[in-house]
Amino acid sequence: MAQLLQGSTLVLSDDSKVQAESHLSNKIVALYFSAGWCPPCRNFTPKLKRFYEVVKKAGKNFEVVFVSRDRAAEDLVEYYKDHHGEWTYLEFGDPHIQEFLEKYEIKTIPALKVIKPDGTVVVNDARTEVVDKGAENPLALFEEWEAFYES
């Protein structure tokens, strides 16, 4: 993950900040593009939160990075605090946000992409997978992602 988010700061659920390179090292990472003003996002976020909690409770090395499409920093923080899991987010205005929107061709939200450290997409439509497969058996889905990640 060092190459993709080099020099970036991530915010944790307790408001502390960490360097992306060290925090994401040796983890399977999903970029979550979402916004509080988006009804489909507010519908999907609790599903992702449940998936994340089950996977983390099982001791898996998994991290979600919230890439906000909110229009103001206050909106980002409010949406994150009220609805998201205990994952990380890029600070409002981080230059990587625009880079990721272009690189991953994000046209609509919510979008969830599982990526390798070099930025290669492992699972392009992870959102649909979380909704369709992750609701019944989150760990089985995550193990599929692990297999893709290692190949």
Give a label for each model feature.
Residues 33-50:
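Conserved redox-active cysteine motifs that mediate thiol-disulfide chemistry
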Residues 27, 34-37, 108:
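Short pre-active-site segment immediately N-terminal to redox-active cysteine/selenocysteine motifs
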Residues 92, 102-149:
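Non-catalytic, surface beta->alpha helical segment in thiol-disulfide oxidoreductase systems
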Residues 6-29, 54:
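A short beta-strand-turn-helix
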Residues 44-46, 78-81, 102-103, 126-128:
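Short coil/turn segments at secondary-structure boundaries
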Residues 59-75, 84-96:
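Thiol-based oxidoreductase modules, predominantly thioredoxin-like and allied folds used
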